[in-house]
Structures are given as structure tokens and as C-alpha cells.
Amino acid sequence: MDNFPNKTYKVIYADPPWYFKSRSEKGEGRNPNQHYDCMELKDIMNLPVKDIADDNCILLMWAIDPMLDKALQVINAWGFQYKTVGFTWAKTNRTNLGFFTGLGYWTRANQEMCLLATKGRPKRKAKDVAQLVVEPRQEHSKKPLLHKKIEKLVDGPYIELFARKKPFPNWDYWGNEV
């Protein structure tokens, strides 16, 4: 993942490729490193995100339950202060309206959180952006498209870090799959 951006953004949207060991009766096929290149925590923390964050910036970062404490470390390392959960994705099954039941160390996981952190005093545009997102689960780690919700919530410029595709022309994207 070269060519880190060299301009500043008011919104940074990130889905870090966390490296962690998972246990599954189905084997390593559910482990993230079987699907994409993962990064160690120290490498994620050392990315120069501080350099691209505007003085008044929002960070929206996906975090899986077992990595929540690590996600908070990343937020701090990148120069942000945790505020709240920005979005909660309740996963449904692909073929019916029932909720998806995933893995879990204590309880079976269904949701993923997108944490919201700030630097400075960014301005919120709308007060009616819902936190809950109910959408079908897709291929491994693919998140629902929240870009329009984010655009309604705050003004850009916008960047998605660790992006896989470029779905919206008014966003910048960085990652080894774009």
C-alpha cells in the first residue's frame, strides 16, 4: 500500500485489515488473512493518518468485537478522540430476512461497529442520520456502502482508507485493492 495521500481531509473512513487469530471448527477459511493482506497493529498505528487529517476531522473506523481495545489504540495513535459508535451494521442473511449468526468467542456475533472519533471540532450537517444499518452480509469483510449517509452527516473532502473499490466519484480512495 504505497502512495499515501498528501492532502488533508475532513472525513476519514477506514476499515483496517486487522491481523488476529481466529478459531473456527471450519478451519482457517474464516480467518481474515485467507482473504486479504492483513496488518499488524503497530503497522496500522504507524500509518501517517495524522498528516492527512484536517484540523477539524471525523474518523469513522470499522472495528470487530475482539479488536475493540486495539481500535481505540489506533484512534488515539492517529490523533483522534473516541466519541461514539457512528454506525452499527446488523447483518442479515443473503437469502432471507433473518439475522445472520456469525462466530463469537462468548456469544455469536451478528453486528459490526463503525466507531466515530473526532479531531478538533468538526461540524455535523444533519441530525437525522440513523446509527443502525440493517443489510445482508456479503463476501468476507465487505461492508455496506455508507458513503451517502456519511455525506449527509458531514461535509468533505472524503477519503476511504483500505478501500477495495471506488464506488463514489467525489471520494478519494487508498488501499492495495484499488
What are these regions (language model features)?
Residues 1-178:
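Class I S-adenosyl-L-methionine-dependent methyltransferase catalytic core
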